[in-house]
Amino acid sequence: MHQPTTTEDLVASDCGLRERKKQQTRSAIHRSALALVTDHGLAGVTVEQICADAGVSPRTFFNYFPSKAEAALGLPATTVPETARAAFLGSTGALVADLCDLVAHTVTLPQDRRRMKELVRARPEMVPAMMQWMAHARQTVLAVAAERVDEDAARTATTLVMAAVIESAHRSADGSRDELAARLRAVVGEMGRLATA
């Protein structure tokens, strides 16, 4: 096993460990919320029960998820990374193709989509939380798109690419963000062909 030997190695090792711990905590909260909401419904579960089951405090819970519905669905926060924003705004390429890249680097699809779909089917009260998450993701992307083109073009292009996100989530397994961008471009292309068929 590699032992850290330099200050840089120690910092990188610490950051890696810290990031793994965050992912483990997030995953524990999600698993607990998913199990409890599946068994008892959204109204039948409290944040405190989720926290007790996951072994975290309510303060920790709210550092990871804004609500018990989002925790049960495993919906991550949607923020545009500065590097993706700068690449999109600085590009002179095709708007929709560039938006596919921006969305792929901004919107993180839930890891366990199969269980998420099962939860939504079993507990329809979860649908509004999912729709709200999608609307927030769309608004986040739209705000950046509107910095590059007029608002009408930004809205139409963003709506098209977000529809491709939904379709892509139904079709494919996980992959890298670059693979997601390629899938989004393929789905958008298919939508265009269907629209003119």
Task: Pin down the residues of each PLM region.
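C-terminal peripheral helix-coil segments that are non-catalytic and often amphipathic
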Residues: 1-9, 174-197
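Hydrophobic/aromatic-rich alpha-helical bundle segments in the mid-to-C-terminal region
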Residues: 147-189
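Basic, helix-initiating cap at the start of DNA-binding domains
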Residues: 1-40, 44-53
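Short, basic, alpha-helical segments at the C-terminal edge of helix-turn-helix-like DNA-binding modules
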Residues: 38, 46-47, 76-84
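Short secondary-structure transition hinges
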Residues: 78-82, 111-139
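HTH DNA-binding helix-turn interface
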Residues: 16, 41-42, 56, 62-72
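Amphipathic alpha-helical packing segments from all-alpha helical-bundle domains
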Residues: 124-159, 167
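Hydrophobic alpha-helical connector segments
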Residues: 82-116
